[in-house]
């Protein structure tokens, strides 16, 4: 009974909009906005206008364990009327800024849907320039089913990208913190410098990379002096 009640609550926005002829309703959400390494991933998703038992545990992806998210992602794709995931690179975030990258990415994710939505729901962000009306819902990834589905797609896809990236850059521990600004991560940047996948426009990355560069420069000076002395 509790599961049925929750499914109905999550569908409230979509059902109300569809009844007013504004469907299909797409949800949009992002993952990685607060990270300092790797891309920001943005997903859009349209779900059928009916309860889906397979998605009964659907909620804000941050509240779900990694195994549950991994299990849910293929189910969301299976049941979705349409879905898309796009990625904005760290280089583009540095070039255009995180806010512009986020909004631009949300527009691109909606445009990439194979079915054109009649209405778009977002998790708190207003998206100008959409071809249809939209509504930002604070905490939407926990209260609107289509946003929760987009949240799972964005976060799980990005987590997989960061796990793969950890193979290329093992010195940063990316598989654990997924590019967020943990102490372990920032200490690694101070030791090794920032990688091409870091967001150099972020103050903490710039500071840690500068500390690495200064320490690296001091070491080179010391080594040069040692060689000259040995000569």
Swiss-Prot record:
Annotated compartments: Cytoplasm
Domain of life: Bacteria
Entry-linked Gene3D superfamilies: Ribonuclease H-like superfamily/Ribonuclease H (3.30.420.10)
Binding annotation for a divalent metal cation: 29-30, 123
Protein family according to the UniProt entry: Belongs to the RNase HII family.
Function according to Swiss-Prot or TrEMBL: Endonuclease that specifically degrades the RNA of RNA-DNA hybrids.
UniProt key word Metal-binding: yes
Listed GO CC annotations: cytoplasm; ribonuclease H2 complex
Pfam families reported for this sequence: RNase_HII
Covalent S-S links between cysteines: none
Provenance organism: Corynebacterium efficiens (strain DSM 44549 / YS-314 / AJ 12310 / JCM 11189 / NBRC 100395)
Biological process terms in GO annotation: DNA replication, removal of RNA primer; mismatch repair
Obligatory cofactor(s): Mn(2+); Mg(2+)
PROSITE patterns for the chain: RNASE_H_2
Catalytic activity: Endonucleolytic cleavage to 5'-phosphomonoester
InterPro entries in alphabetical order: RNase_HII, RNase_HII/HIII, RNase_HII/HIII_dom, RNaseH-like_sf, RNaseH_sf
Protein name (database record): Ribonuclease HII
Keywords linked to the UniProt accession: Cytoplasm, Endonuclease, Hydrolase, Manganese, Metal-binding, Nuclease
Cofactor note: Manganese or magnesium. Binds 1 divalent metal ion per monomer in the absence of substrate. May bind a second metal ion after substrate binding.
